Curated annotation (Swiss-Prot):
It comes from Photorhabdus laumondii subsp. laumondii (strain DSM 15139 / CIP 105565 / TT01) (Photorhabdus luminescens subsp. laumondii). One of its GO terms (molecular function) is 3-isopropylmalate dehydratase activity. This is 3-isopropylmalate dehydratase small subunit. One of its GO terms (biological process) is L-leucine biosynthetic process. It comes from the Bacteria. The gene is leuD.
Length: 201
C-alpha cells in the first residue's frame, strides 16, 4: 500500500523548460541503486550544480532559489519525462519531495511510471499552463491546491479542470500499487484456490 492521494496543497516551483528528459531528471551515473530512496539529492543534478561532485549549487536554477525551497508541486512545459524509460525519474522527484507535476503533456512511459510511484501527473492545456506560469512569476512562493477527487487545480481565485483515467484515479486515491490491487480480491483468490482439485494446489 502507498500513501493515499486525495488533495494536496503545496509550494509551486516553475521549471520553464520543454522536453525535460529523464537523463536531466536523474543522470545515468546515479542509477546504481535499486531502492526508491536516495535519488532526491541527485534530482536535476546537471542543472542544480556547477560541478560534477554536487558541491557548488547553481544559484540561477529554480530549485536553488530560496523562495522555492520545500516545493512539492512542479510546473513544467510539454513532453515532460521524455527519453529513456527509467523509473528512477519519478523516484528522484518523489524522494526530493514532489507530489505533483503539472504540464501540457508527458512522455507515455514516464506518465505511467509516475502513477506507479504515487506522483500525480496533471495534464492541462497550453493556455492554462501559460496562465499558471504567469501567476507563479507574479506571486512568488505561491501555493496551488490539487484536488484529485474533484479533478481540479486551484490557483489564486481560479480553478482548472483536468482529466484522468478513472482506474488510475481510483488507485491514487486509495494508495493502491499492483500488490494492493491484488489484495483487494484476496477473498475471491482464496475461494478460487480452494475450489481447485487437490493436485493443482
Amino acid at each position: 500500500m502507498m500513501e493515499k492521494f486525495i488533495q494536496h496543497t503545496g509550494l509551486v516551483a516553475p521549471l520553464d523548460a520543454a522536453n525535460v528528459d529523464t537523463d536531466a531528471i536523474i543522470p545515468k551515473q546515479f542509477l546504481q541503486k535499486v531502492t526508491r530512496t536516495g535519488f532526491g539529492q541527485h534530482l536535476f543534478h546537471d542543472w542544480r550544480f556547477l560541478d560534477d561532485a554536487g558541491q557548488k549549487p547553481n544559484p540561477e536554477f529554480v530549485l536553488n532559489q530560496p523562495c522555492y525551497q520545500g516545493a512539492s508541486i512542479l510546473l513544467a512545459r510539454e513532453n515532460f519525462g521524455c527519453g529513456s524509460s527509467r523509473e528512477h525519474a519519478p523516484w528522484a522527484l518523489t524522494d526530493y519531495g514532489f507530489k505533483v507535476v503539472i504540464a501540457p503533456s508527458f512522455a507515455d512511459i514516464f506518465y505511467g511510471n509516475a502513477f506507479n510511484n504515487q506522483l500525480l501527473p496533471v495534464k492541462l492545456n497550453d493556455t492554462d499552463v501559460n496562465e499558471l506560469f504567469e501567476w507563479v512569476q507574479q506571486n512568488k512562493a505561491c501555493r496551488f491546491t490539487v484536488d484529485l477527487e474533484q479533478q481540479k487545480v486551484h490557483a489564486g481565485n481560479k480553478s482548472y479542470d483536468f482529466e484522468i483515467d478513472s482506474f488510475r484515479r481510483h488507485c491514487m486515491m486509495n494508495g493502491l500499487d499492483s500488490i494492493g490491487l491484488t489484495l483487494q480480491h484476496l477473498d475471491a483468490i482464496i475461494t478460487y484456490e480452494q475450489e481447485q482439485p487437490v493436485f493443482l494446489r
